[in-house]
């Protein structure tokens, strides 16, 4: 579950954020403006400090000129990032650089160029310097990008060991039960914000499966709001501004972090004292040790549980919502997915099992195609620490080195009928099987998302339940545009129409 995307519009985003968080309060606005100015000075000094001489004979990537000091291409990129990158690819090729808010970003587009980022060592292209300031206030100290990369890799390995087939077989009936109970309130027909609904359901199912019944039992409206406040820490402002600023969203994030940690601490202590066997990630973390034999602390366990929930929630809820609109737009495909349920599981549609879920190949391809056209994360980034050579160019230290799954997964050079939603493209030879980094919605290399398989289990189980219960339609033909102002690229106004299937 790759967590985060790229700051897309420096000045515009800050203006929007200031207007929202201050409510027009002059003092608050001035404080934020001062803090932002200090941040700009810091970024400028940082950028200057990163100016290094390239090795003799080395050639820099093509640089897209901007007459606007400091902000550079931030506004143009923020308005239409995909169009900006695709136009740059056509003009400059697979490797190019440009400036935004005082930083230089070098994009690697296409499978061959992207290999540099995904095959890199952390000491050459560093992730902590990019993502640490965002994740640490949300997850806490001692986990993810707050620790040396070797420790983070151990933590990911521990989590991955708990996301296994034996656990998945137990999770499917849990997720199905949660989904059926959730949809009881929908009635026979209506219109719903499907992204909001699926976000709620995915929090419920993920908490039950990963955190265990102790934590799931406490997931009421108050705790759900705490999760929302914590999730509110993943913003462009949080990426740009110091974490200690007294912004309302930062204060809500920090308060939610403390309260959720306290809930987790109590659940951890209760589990340690319990003699009942449990099959969830919480138990996996309690039973695991690092290579040196040290057990995980309660602080580390709670931080990893928060990270698992929020990172997975973003990927699964966004993908699930987008797939709903693709299926609503293509009613014959939606009907094929429903008939697949009967063909694989039985005409009377008995409770789902993991083995049946594996055989829902069309539904699987629909998820895969949704992730191709609407990957949750538009950009994956690293900080260049050493000179890096790719496609005949040398990227100097200090550049933000980026790969865009969204662009790679719709390049004209790689994908036939690239903008069409066609799940059957995966039945033939395609770039996803032939080009190693043409299809990377979950990342690749050492930072590949460890929750990919769980995400598929979760989404397939939820959508199997939804297809069995309802038919879905667009409202007056409306298909959402992409909201590029958020760090996770959600659908705009994602309201969908539904009607219960006749028995």
Swiss-Prot record:
EC number assigned by the record: 1.14.14.154
Catalyzed reactions: a 14alpha-methyl steroid + 3 reduced [NADPH--hemoprotein reductase] + 3 O2 = a Delta(14) steroid + formate + 3 oxidized [NADPH--hemoprotein reductase] + 4 H2O + 4 H(+); lanosterol + 3 reduced [NADPH--hemoprotein reductase] + 3 O2 = 4,4-dimethyl-5alpha-cholesta-8,14,24-trien-3beta-ol + formate + 3 oxidized [NADPH--hemoprotein reductase] + 4 H2O + 4 H(+); 24,25-dihydrolanosterol + 3 reduced [NADPH--hemoprotein reductase] + 3 O2 = 4,4-dimethyl-8,14-cholestadien-3beta-ol + formate + 3 oxidized [NADPH--hemoprotein reductase] + 4 H2O + 4 H(+); a 14alpha-methyl steroid + reduced [NADPH--hemoprotein reductase] + O2 = a 14alpha-hydroxymethyl steroid + oxidized [NADPH--hemoprotein reductase] + H2O + H(+)
Binding site for heme: 449
Any single GO BP term: negative regulation of amyloid-beta clearance
This protein's pathway: Steroid biosynthesis; zymosterol biosynthesis; zymosterol from lanosterol: step 1/6
Main location: endoplasmic reticulum
TM helices/strands, residue ranges: 24-44
Keywords: Cholesterol biosynthesis, Cholesterol metabolism, Endoplasmic reticulum, Heme, Iron, Lipid biosynthesis, Lipid metabolism, Membrane, Metal-binding, Microsome, Monooxygenase, Oxidoreductase, Steroid biosynthesis, Steroid metabolism, Sterol biosynthesis, Sterol metabolism, Transmembrane, Transmembrane helix, Ubl conjugation
Names of the cofactor(s): heme
Major enzyme class: oxidoreductase
Knockout-associated phenotype: Embryonic lethality at 15 dpc, likely due to heart failure. Mutant mice present complete block of de novo cholesterol synthesis at 14.5 dpc. Heart abnormalities include hypoplasia combined with ventricle septum and epicardial and vasculogenesis defects. Skeletal abnormalities include facial hypoplasia, brachycephaly, and bowed and jointed bones of the extremities with camptodactyly. Can serve as an animal model for studying Antley-Bixler syndrome.
An example molecular function term from Gene Ontology annotations: sterol 14-demethylase activity
Similarity remark: Belongs to the cytochrome P450 family.
Function: Sterol 14alpha-demethylase that plays a critical role in the cholesterol biosynthesis pathway, being cholesterol the major sterol component in mammalian membranes as well as a precursor for bile acid and steroid hormone synthesis.
Name of the protein: Lanosterol 14-alpha demethylase
Organism placement in taxonomy: Eukaryota, Metazoa, Chordata, Craniata, Vertebrata
Gene: Cyp51a1
């Amino acid at each position: 579950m790759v967590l985060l995307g790229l700051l897309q519009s420096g000045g515009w985003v800050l203006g929007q954020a200031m207007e929202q968080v201050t409510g027009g309060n002059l003092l608050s606005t001035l404080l934020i403006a001062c803090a932002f100015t200090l941040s700009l000075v810091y970024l400028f000094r940082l950028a200057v400090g990163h100016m290094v001489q390239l090795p003799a004979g080395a050639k820099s990537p093509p640089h897209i000129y901007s007459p606007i000091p400091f902000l550079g291409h931030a506004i143009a990129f923020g308005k239409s990032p995909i169009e900006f990158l695709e136009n740059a690819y056509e003009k400059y090729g697979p490797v190019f650089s440009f400036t935004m808010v005082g930083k230089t970003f070098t994009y690697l587009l296409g499978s061959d160029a992207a290999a540099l980022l995904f095959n890199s060592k952390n000491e050459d292209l560093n992730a902590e310097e990019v993502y640490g300031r965002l994740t640490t206030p949300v997850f806490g100290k001692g986990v993810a990008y707050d620790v040396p990369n070797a420790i983070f890799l151990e933590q990911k390995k521990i989590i991955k060991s708990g996301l296994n087939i034996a656990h998945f077989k137990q999770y499917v009936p849990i997720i199905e039960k949660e989904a059926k109970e959730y949809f009881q309130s929908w009635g026979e027909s209506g219109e719903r914000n499907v992204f909001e609904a699926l976000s709620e359901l995915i929090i419920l199912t993920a908490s039950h499966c990963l955190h265990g019944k102790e934590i799931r039992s406490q997931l009421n409206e108050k705790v759900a709001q705490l999760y929302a406040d914590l999730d509110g820490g993943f913003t462009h402002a949080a990426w740009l501004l110091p974490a200690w600023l007294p912004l309302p969203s930062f204060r809500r994030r920090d308060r939610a972090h403390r309260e959720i940690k306290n809930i987790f601490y109590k659940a951890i202590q209760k589990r340690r004292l319990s003699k009942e066997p449990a099959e969830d990630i919480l138990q996996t973390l309690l039973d695991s040790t690092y290579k040196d034999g040290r057990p995980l602390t309660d602080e580390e366990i709670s931080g990893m549980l928060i990270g698992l929930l929020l990172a997975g929630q973003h990927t699964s809820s966004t993908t699930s919502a987008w797939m709903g609109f693709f299926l609503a737009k293509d009613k014959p495909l939606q009907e094929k997915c429903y008939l697949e349920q009967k063909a694989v599981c039985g005409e009377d549609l008995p409770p789902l099992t993991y083995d049946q879920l594996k055989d829902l190949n069309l539904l699987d391809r629909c998820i895969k195609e949704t992730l191709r056209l609407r990957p949750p994360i538009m950009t994956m980034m690293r900080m260049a620490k050493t000179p890096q050579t790719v496609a005949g160019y040398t990227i100097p230290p200090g550049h933000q080195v980026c790969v865009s799954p969204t662009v790679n997964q719709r390049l004209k050079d790689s994908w036939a009928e690239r903008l069409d939603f066609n799940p059957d493209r995966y039945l033939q030879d395609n770039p996803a099987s032939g080009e190693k980094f043409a299809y990377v919605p979950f990342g690749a290399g050492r930072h590949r998302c460890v929750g990919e398989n769980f995400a598929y289990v979760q989404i397939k189980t939820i959508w199997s339940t939804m297809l069995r219960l309802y038919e879905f339609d667009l409202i007056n033909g409306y298909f959402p545009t992409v909201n590029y102002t958020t760090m996770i690229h959600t659908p705009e106004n994602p309201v969908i129409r539904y009607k219960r299937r006749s028995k």
